[in-house]
Amino acid sequence: MARGKKTQETGSSKRRSKVQEEEEHVEGSEEEVEEPEQKSSKRGSRKTTNSTSNKKKSVKKVESDDDDEDDLSELDVVVEDDNPVETSDNDEVATTPQQEKSSRSRKNRGDHESHDDNSDNEEQGDRGNRREHKPRPKVDPNTPIGKLATDQILQFLQERGEESFNPQLKHGARQLLNQLLGKYNGQRYGSKRGGPPRGSFGQRGGFNSRGRGMPPRMRQGDTRDTRDTRDTRLRFNTTQSNRRELNDQSDDLYND
């Protein structure tokens, strides 16, 4: 019998525990339902506070706009006071200090631009004068040669070469005239710089048998006597037995 009582007691305790768990579950669900309600109420309160703050801001904006309008009206009055007024004494327009400053700045700009234009025109005029070549007066062919200077004689020869289509006379007289007047540039035997891109093709130009040629002293050729070379060739190409005869023949040739 004792065993049966224990089983009944355990069954009743299990039932009680289940009932307690269900009650706790129901209470937890109620709490969960209450939490979103509280959140929604908080959101509503926030919205109401935001709406009230927006209303306050709008009221402030309206007030600030009114203040700005008042300020603008004051500014308009000031500007109207600063507008130019025609005076009856001098019949001139009275300007404000700001307008005077702006007019001065405009005048200064105009003067500066006009000065620049004048300077540009002067530079162009100088360039034009530099490019202009004043021709020398022609020499009268009827004047005696004793009364002509050297440059006049050379100029006359140059003119005669142009008229007679003689380029040698024309260019020769012109070169002599330029040399006499100090306008002659001597012949240049090559430049010292390299080719178009630096370092390519070695050292092109200068005194290295390329470009405009070698200097004149290096182009003189062999200065030795050709007769000596001819004698040496004959001597080395023959035998010793015939040397005396060849020497006699060469002496006879030189004596002749």
UniProtKB/Swiss-Prot annotation:
The UniProt record lists the keyword Secreted: no
Basic and acidic residues bias spans: 108-129, 219-234
Keywords, comma-separated and alphabetical: Coiled coil
Biased composition (Gly residues): 192-205
Sequence segments annotated as region (Disordered): 1-171, 185-256
Coiled-coil stretches: 14-39
Domain of life: Viruses
UniProt biased composition (Acidic residues): 21-35, 64-92
Protein name: Uncharacterized protein R561
Organism: Acanthamoeba polyphaga mimivirus (APMV)
